[in-house]
Amino acid sequence: MKIADIVAQKKHFPFFDCAYQGFASGDLENDAWAVRYFAEAGFEMCVAQSYAKNLGLYGQRAGCFHFVTHTEETKTRILSQLEILQRSEISNPPAYGARVASTVLNDEALFREWEDNLRTMSGRIIEMRGRLYNKLVELGTPGGWGHITKQIGMFSL
């Protein structure tokens, strides 16, 4: 993968923000492909996952932070720093959202239902992109609008 090669060549540190996992393709596994690729390629990296959007837990601060490393020493140092940051930033995070996320992630039937809901939402996003594109073309709106249907996810540039 070209991006991974450049990141390695320039000695950059990858940080993935997975705030909308499942919305791009409708599949959690597919949307996490790049993260798995970098991990399998041996990169140390950070991954932030939020359940605010894809589980509808807005304002609940439900999510995960992962630091992928290869040494026990680095793991110990990172854990120490994360504990300090967590204490100063959110010493008492809301528990409700974390409980909901944990319940969904650990119950096979609820997890499958969540995956089905993500597929539905992703399909709706694709449908809305198509409708927006068609309306812009129908109205003769100046500009090229092909990017709206070529891109994926909730946002369009």
What are the language-model segments listed below?
Residues 40-115:
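Conserved core segment of the aminotransferase class I/II
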Residues 2, 37, 100-103, 131:
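Alpha-helical scaffold segments in soluble metabolic enzymes
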Residues 113-157:
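Conserved PLP-binding catalytic core of the aspartate aminotransferase-like
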Residues 1-13, 18-57, 64:
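Active-site pre-lysine segment of PLP-dependent enzymes
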Residues 31-35, 79, 129:
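Amphipathic alpha-helical segments in well-structured domains
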Residues 2-3, 51-52, 88-89, 142-144:
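Generic recognition of flexible, low-complexity loop/linker segments
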